[in-house]
């Protein structure tokens, strides 16, 4: 291929990358500035091209899913935001295991519906949690005693630096509570495979009802828009023991301070439904949310001698304001 044809091919391969794209309409808080570059790769080749573009231009990468667990700076993100659109699923039976492989960009509720349409049970326990397959794997999605890793078999991953694709077993991910190897950000998820239980038509109807009930329960207990879910992570047993406290739940301490539905900054307010959830009432900025949560952190520390730290990802910040 001559140089001109090669340059044209590269331009065509990168034509899906956009400049200066607002991120405030791509996350649940509905705040944040622009991403310098943004793309939604629909194929593995486009995914590789995006990573090559970032590497060639020395750009940091932000991997975006549903945007339900992030706080994006009002200044935006100075690199390349990648929002994978690998959304296909495939059901296959191997060694008597009933497996479903799903692309990293697939909406998790869509995956649950796909499984139930094929009379496969297990993932419905995660119904109503806003996530993609990639985001769910990144944090090892959990709901009460259920962990995504309980169903996980293997994943296809892509290397940030080289674009290498490989298939790895569950053990590679080193899953823990809110934890996986993906958080080291050297590799990104392309697809994940889950082992599920085949069920009868009658059991499928029950599972669908169970999914609806789980969603109803979540929507009754938690705000389901303009929030990132729990803002602060719960304390570890070691943190609680070192501070001579008994409970790991951050919401307990915030409730004790009477802040639920009361404390606000600008258009950001602590939800009346849950003390560890912040809601954008319509026109909040990231700065409003940051000021509110820093105030919450300070009040808990002063009252109980224990410092809550954010569970959500902070994107586009030059330093972590919660660790000053």
Model-derived regions, located:
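Short loop/turn motifs at secondary-structure junctions and domain boundaries
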Residues: 147-149
